[in-house]
Amino acid sequence: MDKTVIFAVAGSGKTYRIVERLDEVRRVLIVTYTEANRDNLRTRIIQKFGYFPANIVLYTYFTFLHSFCYRPFLLSEKRTKGVTYARSSEKGPKFGLDDDRRYMTKGRWLYHHRLAKYVEQTDTVKDVIARIEKYFDAFFVDEVQDFAGHDFNLLMALCRSEVECMFVGDFFQHTYDTSRDGAVNINLHADYEKYKARFKAAKMELDLASLIKSRRCSKSVCDFITEQIGIRIESHSDALTDVRLVEDHAVAQDLYQSPKIVKLFLQEHYKYGCYSQNWGASKGLDHYEDVCVVLHPAALDAWKAGALATLNPETRNKLYVACSRARGNLTFVPDAFLKQHKRKQAK
């Protein structure tokens, strides 16, 4: 069976690649991390077929982990109530790997960041693999770069299934982790070469060539990302668009008021009362034309110094995500120009 991981760039057609492989006969399991990308995939599938075919199953990751990997095999025995996104206490008692109390609260809610390990520890992985092989012909994973901690280890185990496996992602769009648990895979995303080696070790073929050009971003935006943010990306198009920093207060207010131009903030976009999103949360969103990226002071200083590539990796990756949402013009605005609109408390 084919086992492939495709390393792509923003806007290169990751979603299209998945959807083009679908038909109305082959049974396909699709897993992605964020709800936004789940919704985007669902929309694209319906656009292709006019409806959502019954032979295709689409999950967000933690729904897949709990309802597909855990419930059929362990729920009746363990009598758990669901999944909690609260973390286990660092100050509480330490339980061993074979102690159920390590994986759930006193009220029997499963810790999300240890659920994949629980599936492994209970020797359930082989059952999950058998279930995938029984019900599906192919297993596709989108946003693979966000799998971390025990979740990444589980994913590497599941790719041993005797079905086609295709994982798609962009290493530099790693802005969130599915979960973290102590030092488990803590340096997974610290080195691109070592990251790729993990997939090779799982006997997956690496595709580094088929999705290297963005179909979304103009040459101007791609050149800016490559030269200033330090992440290589090319454009399928020779189109030129504006990439600029606004330093005029009145112009910034016009951008703020515009219902057609999304404002992307590092965080707390909801406090500004405009058409907006956060940098990282804009990942998977493909419907913006012109984009306004709001720069906090450290990012503004780096922009002016030509040093955006030196931002800490998490911030740099989120900035890359934000900039690569633009199909048209890419405008930067200092957040100082928009502070007057920020609510002290979200309503």
Model-inferred region functions:
Residues 1-347:
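The feature marks helicase ATPase cores and/or their adjacent C-terminal helical subdomains
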